[in-house]
Amino acid sequence: MQNPGYKVTTSPLAHLTAGLKPVSTTTGVTLQDASLQARVGFRGRQAAGWLELHGYQVPVRANQATWQTDGSLVVRLSASEFMVLADSAASQQSVQQLEAGWQLSDIACYLLPRQDTHAWLRLRGPDIAAMMAKLCAVDLSAAAFPAGAVAQTSVARANSIVINAAKPGESAEFWLLIDSSLAAWFWEACGDAMTEFAGQYLPQ
């Protein structure tokens, strides 16, 4: 059985981000809704091999993330569970194709649609670790939480996946994935926390 794929067209934060305007300069922390970007999950004892068969480089250990040549990010959540997230136009298409191309077969790799289940927020700026310290008990400083690290933890009392998605030579960047039903509340909690760090909201 082939999966028809799914493309999300509305963010759970659309009512909060609709009026946002681009900003000319950003010196502090920025918060952006990335929920319209493609993302998909896979689970099973052969999920790593299935992803490698489709050209993806898989992190060796759990709670690690690896950038791909198409601009997507593969996140390993456990020995047998992965998430693939798009961060470019090319990877948006490839991640959607990856989801649509999955078929139920004898291979122990099972599709976990993530467009509806998880909202996706981006935090950028030099002070994001200090800002997150107000919301999360885990040490997310650069020394303890380097680029490519993943934490499955509580942020603002909500179960969250935190990914250090920083690239070499670019500003610090965290991706936060949380239950879509909590997206609006979580957005406001992050907004309150970034106030003292010259926080700004960015449009999608």
Region locations from a protein language model:
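Basic, glycine/lysine-rich polyanion-binding surfaces/domains
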Residues: 1-204
